[in-house]
Amino acid sequence: MSDFLRDVIKNAGNEYASIVDDGVEAGDVDSFIDTGSYIFNALLSGSVNGGLPSNKITAIAGESATGKTYFLMGIVKNFLDADPDAGVIYFESESAITRNMVVDRGIDPKRMVIFPVTTVQEFRTQAIRVIDDYMAQNEIDRKPLFLCLDSLGMLSTTKEVEDTTDGKETRDMTRAQVLKAAFRVLTLKLGRAKVPMVVTNHTYESMGLFSTKEMGGGSGLKYAASSIIYLSKKKEKDGTEVIGNIIHCKNHKSRLTKENKMVDVRLTYDKGLDRYYGLLELAEKYEVFKKVSTRYELPDGSKQFGKAILNDPETYFTEDIMHKLDLAAETEFKYGAGSEETIQDSDD
């Protein structure tokens, strides 16, 4: 049967086809991209050491002014910091990104390319061309690449632009279909190229007796994205000064981890994503750290206030503690998780 199946693949002419035991070329996730936040990594992948799937589309959605762009730029910074040869293609539809903004966020401007796009068709054509050019390189010459679209909600269509130019006020009813077609093609190409993409989008409250938060743009991105994260925020203050935001991240949809889980991450104006924020709550829930009155009891028996731990995280989140938290994250976020190695016994 094995020989027959290989003949079927050969004769079918489908370059993506493979026997599952050999790996599913465009489907298997063989690596993850660190987002710069351990708890956000866990929400997306079930591991504090994971993050964005390296060959999938991830959507980050929220209402206006929830920090979607700054959140995405924090991920971009961490991606570029992790590999000096990495590059970012940033499709931008809001005319909101400036060179100073990129430099102020600590992002290397020499390795980030901005593609201004107005329509879905422009984005689709240029994104596919980028991926095709990337795949045309010898595999050994391909450096890590990250694609971003900020934002989907601001993209028009060719028809809408033409109608506006002609003074017509008719609504373009084809936009959802054009988007769906674009993401159908991109999903497979990104999977094969092993290139991640993050798309920001807006949300709105649906009409009805029980209103729910919905993502704009039709069903195209909803079906194409492996994860959809809804963002909301509250201001982070140091005394009376606003120094950033606490971003509430809800896993609205995921093919890799449990849906409807929520975590908080901290995004500061000067440092971007806080790598350790959110781990304290996970440590408390799984008794890696035990809450005793207003302090936390550490495995060595010492007690510290939560603020002291967060102010010096590298001292307290040791390699052993991070291993226990990784086990906790697997249990908390992964489907059917239940590691044979228990969290309490991981240091035996």
What are these regions (language model features)?
Residues R6, K10, Y38, A42, ...:
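Solvent-exposed alpha-helical segments within well-ordered globular domains of core cellular machineries
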Residues T58-I60, I89-F91, V113-F115, V198, ...:
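Hydrophobic/aromatic beta-strand patches that form the interior of the parallel beta-sheet core
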Residues D172-Y286:
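Phosphate-binding/switch region of NTP-binding enzymes
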Residues R275-F305:
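Long, well-ordered amphipathic alpha-helical subdomains in the mid-to-C-terminal portions
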